[in-house]
Structures are given as C-alpha cells and as structure tokens.
From Swiss-Prot:
Segments forming a coiled coil: none
Lineage top rank: taxon: Eukaryota
Biased composition (Polar residues): 557-568
Protein name, entry field: Uncharacterized protein C2orf81 homolog
Length: 597
C-alpha cells in the first residue's frame, strides 16, 4: 500500500511539471504610477488599507471619550446640588426681607431750576426733498406784515389788491381836510409780484416817515418782479378819516439813522427807480410837495402822479369811480454796469529760471520811436508764419516789444553743459527790439587777443574748443559800445556817429552761443536787432532793414555784440529746413540811430 501511495504521488508531480511546462509564459502586468516616479498603484493600495484601519481605531476612541465625559458631568452635577440649593435659599430670604422694609423715593428736587431737566420738543416732520420724484423746488418768500392784515378786509374777487393804510403814509405830510364826502384811499394793484419786501416788518408809527417835509413820488415794485406794472385805484371808505387822502411819497436820500432807511436800502431804491433809457427818458424825482389838489365842490381829492416820458400822467382822477391811466408806467431799464460779466484771469506759465525772484525786472516797457512801427509790425507778421515742424512752447505771458534785459542772477555765466543750444526749447521767440544790458565791463586792451581764455567766467565744455577759438577771432574785431546811462551828444562832431565823446567801453564776452538751426541762411529774414555769422561762407548776415539802408547809402550799423543766454535764446523766421551753423548776435545796449530801434 505504501508503494502504491508513493507511486501516485510521483505521478502527480510528473503530471504537474508537464502541465507547467506546457503553459505559455505570462507577461508582466505594467505598473500604474499614481505619482510618477514616486508612488505606484500597489503602494497606493497598501496605504489605503492602512488608513482604513486607522479610521476604525479613531472612531472607537471618540466613542469612549464621549462616554467618559458624560459620566464625569453627572458626577459634577451631583456634587453641586447642595451649594446651589443654599445660594437660592439665601437670595429668597434677602428678597423677602427687602419687601418688608421698603424705602420711599422722594424724587428729584428743584426740577424747574435744573437745566438738565426739560420737556422734550416735538420732532419736526420729515420734509420732502427737492430731488424726490415729481417734486419742484420752491422758494417761499415771507408775506409782508402790514399787507396780510389788509388781505382779510378785501373782497374775494380781487385777491391781488392790497390797501395802503394810514400806517404806511408819512405822518408829517398829512394835512387835515374838511369834507363831507367819503375820502378817497389810494390802492396799489401790482401785477404779479411775489412779495413786497419794502414794507416788511414796519411799525405803524415809524414807517415811511419823510424827514424835512420833502416828498417825492416813487413807484416801489417788488425785487423779484422784473417789470411790474402798478395800477392805483380809488376806493370809497367812509369809515376812514379824511387824513388818509394823500399821496404815497418817499424820499430818495442817503440818510443813516432814519426809520425808513432800516427797511429800504439804497440798493432797493436803485432797483425800484426806473433807469433812464438811451433816448434820454429820466425819472424826475420831485423833492418838494407833490400834493396836486383840486377842489371840486366841497371835496378834497388826492392825485397820485407817476412821471412818464410825456409828463406826469394822473393815476387817480377826481371822482369816486376807478380810472385807468392812458400811458403805461415806464419799465425799468437794464444797467450794463450791473449785468453779469465773464471774469477772465490770465494764467502765466513760468518757463524762465529765476523769474519768480524778480518778475518785473526782466520785462520792462521802454518808450519806442514812432519810426519803428512799420518794421516791428512786419517782424511780428513774419513771426506768425513760423514753420509748423518747429515745436516751440511759448509762455502764456507776452514779451514786450521794447523790453530791457537785466541779468537775473548775481553772476550770469555761460554754461553750455547745462543748457546747450538745441531746438524744441521751451523759451519764447524774442520780440523785435529786445535788448540786453551789460553788467561788467572789460578794459579795451582785451579786444586784441582772440584766445578763449579771455572769458574767464565762461564755462566751455569738452568738444567746444574750436568753436571758442572762432568766437575769439570774431570777438577780436568787435565794435566799442558807449557806457550805460550816456546818451548821444547833439552837436556837429557827434552828429554822424551818434555816440558820446567819452571813451567807450565794451561788453564782457560771457554769453557766446553756438547755434545750429535747420534753415537756409539765404532764405532767412532776420528781425531788427538780430545778426548771424555763417561759418561755412564766412559771411555776416544783417537784418533786412540795415541792408536796405546800406544800399541807399546810409552808414551801416557797427558789428553786433554777442547776446546773453541767461533768459532766452535767439529765434529767427524760417521757410525751409537745412543743416547750417550760423551764429546769432544782437545790437548793443544803446539804440543805434539807423538800426530802427
């Protein structure tokens, strides 16, 4: 039996090995990376199974902690039962004892004298905003005090009429009259007048009192009505005394302290009195008595007259019936001096350094001869035709035509490194006749040497040495100028030259400028007082006025002196663009007789 069992086991092993050999080799399953290069799918599954076990343990611990806390709270409540009962019993006993011994409240003493105690005011009702939907802003003008009393006595058919009672009439101008007929009372009917501010807050005793017994007829319309028309009617009032039949008169005089002046100012009188028109219509204010009385029978009737262009037309005719005037009241003319006007304030843009320190010292008007008018107007016309490609920012304050320049600093030196000549400058065009004054004077012996070292105050940057030498050569042959403050002597000796007999002095060369404009020098027209030196052709360009005088035979102007660059740079009129390098010069300080300045 044992042999058979071992044989069977041997056969099984052989069969199994044959079956394994007959199976094809299995291909490996590709691994899926959850995190590429760090975590594959097998590791991810292992982590998930471990996390599930931790969640189960956490739930068990949370349930255990909850049960322990509930048991501990029950023990705490059991221990606090006795102290809580004792505290509640104590509070109940104290409350019962306080009820047995109540204290009386006496209240506040001297409430009337205490400023902190007072009755609350009634809150104001909410007003509708003017910006609400459907609302229109309305300005409510207060009604006059005296007029409101008469509104109640009038008939409902004429709501716009109001009476001028005796309280509004002058006390001194009243004259008693003996009449058996009902007295006529003047009534003023203003067409639409929102408010009569003249009679506002007036007392019966001190209203419209005319001092010195001087009266004048004055129509007093409302301020808010531009062209009111007043109609005066007569109303039978037998209950009123005869003293009410008189003329409403006001005195238009400037007198402080009067009772009427407190209610009617001079500005109100100005608006009330019609202004004279262009045809000469004037309102004749009569300062004497204006009571035009006419006795018909035994009745005294008053006449209120308002002046018109043809004469005073009576508004109130004799009789008891209402009369209307044949001429309308002259309307109030507009005063041009009181019309609103545009308030123009020029704004100055300061583009020149050190201008705020001495703003009035640079641009100072000097008298100019009448013969320069034509050349100056021509130069201005040419200045307006400047080429559009030249971007120049002109300041907002105008340069005067005959302005005298004074150096704005204590020592104006040329610093080309800081302000090199270039286009696009923010400095304005120079006006014709714009001159520069010399501050420092040099002895005459300096004029012989052409070296740039002659200008110790000029700061020449690197690269400008050649130009400095050329300027020195030009400066060597410069013309002498008279000192400041000396005018030409009017005699036969100096009549031709126009200079004084004193030894002249020259300007100090501290302001040489090398300027490269983009224009053709042949097509350039210089304004009077400006000259240019063309380095390429070695030619000095003079203004057109000087050239014309030279052709006619008049003596030419002396060679011009170099300008200063402390404030502005020379500008010329251009027509075409081209690369050239001329130099700009200006006339000397004193006016040359034939230079047109």
């Amino acid at each position: 039996m044992s042999h058979e069992g071992s044989r069977q086991a041997r056969d099984r092993g052989v069969t199994r090995s044959k079956a394994e050999k007959a199976r094809p080799p299995t291909q490996p399953v590709p691994q899926v990376d959850i995190v590429p290069g760090r975590l594959n799918e097998a590791e991810w599954i292992a982590f998930m199974s471990l996390e599930e076990g931790e969640d189960i343990v956490g739930d068990i611990l949370a349930d255990l902690v909850t049960r322990v806390m509930e048991c501990a709270f029950k023990v705490y409540l059991t221990q606090q039962c006795v102290p809580f009962t004792i505290s509640q019993a104590r509070e109940a006993m104290l409350q019962i004892t306080e009820w047995r011994f109540l204290a009386r409240d006496e209240g506040e003493s001297a409430v009337a004298e205490d400023p902190t105690w007072g009755e609350d005011e009634e809150p104001l009702a909410c007003t509708t905003d003017a910006w609400a939907q459907g609302s229109v802003p309305v300005l409510h003008a207060p009604a006059p005090v005296g007029v409101e009393e008469h509104f109640h006595n009038e008939e409902p058919g004429n709501p716009d009429q109001f009476l001028i009672d005796s309280s509004w009439l002058g006390r001194e101008s009243q004259e008693p009259t003996q009449s058996s007929e009902p007295s006529a009372e003047p009534r003023v009917n203003p067409r639409p007048t929102p408010a009569m501010e003249v009679f506002e807050e007036a007392e019966p005793r001190d209203a419209l009192e005319v001092p010195h017994r001087q009266e004048s007829i004055l129509t007093v319309p409302s301020k808010e009505s531009l062209r009111p028309t007043l109609e005066v009617q007569t109303v039978h009032s037998p209950q009123l005394s005869p003293k009410l039949s008189q003329v409403v008169s006001l005195q238009t005089c400037e007198r402080t302290g009067s009772s009427f002046g407190s209610h009617l100012s001079l500005q109100d009188l100005y608006h009330c009195v019609p202004q004279p028109d262009a045809a000469g219509d004037r309102l004749n204010l009569k300062n004497k008595g204006q009571l035009c009385r006419s006795s018909i029978g035994s009745a005294d009737r008053s006449l209120l007259s308002v002046p018109t262009p043809d004469g005073p037309s009576p508004f109130l005719q004799p009789g008891g019936m209402e009369r209307r005037p044949s001429h309308k009241t002259p309307t109030m003319r507009l005063d041009p001096s009181r019309l609103p006007r545009h308030w123009v304030r020029p704004v100055a843009e300061v583009l020149i350094p050190d201008l705020e320190a001495r703003p009035l010292e640079i641009y100072r008007v000097r008298p100019r001869k009448s013969q320069v008018g034509a050349s100056a107007s021509e130069s201005q016309a040419l200045g307006s035709r400047t080429h559009s490609k030249l971007q120049v920012s002109i300041p907002r304050f105008p340069l005067k035509r005959c302005a005298t320049f004074r150096s704005s600093g204590p020592d104006p030196t040329l610093n080309l490194a800081q302000s090199s000549p270039s286009f696009g400058s923010n400095l304005p065009f120079l006006s014709p006749g714009f001159r520069f004054l010399a501050r420092n004077l040099v002895p005459p012996d300096v004029a012989s040497a052409p070296s740039p070292k002659l200008w110790p105050r000029a700061k020449w940057p690197s690269g400008w040495e050649r130009e400095a030498e050329q300027l020195g050569e030009l400066w060597a042959g410069r013309t002498r100028v008279p000192p400041q403050g000396q005018e030409p002597v009017e005699d036969s000796v100096s009549e031709d030259s126009g200079w004084p007999l004193a030894v002249p002095q020259v300007l100090e060369a501290t302001s040489q400028v090398l300027w490269k404009p983009m224009v053709i020098s042949e097509n350039m027209k210089l304004v009077p007082g400006v000259s240019m030196w063309n380095r390429g052709t070695q030619e000095l360009l003079n203004p057109a006025a000087i050239q014309e005088e030279a052709e006619e035979g008049t003596p030419q102007a002396p060679e011009q002196q170099p300008i200063q660059t402390g404030v502005s740079k020379p500008q010329v009129i251009m027509k075409q663009l081209r690369n050239e390098t001329p130099k700009a010069w200006l006339l000397p300080t004193k006016p040359v007789p034939h230079s047109g300045s």
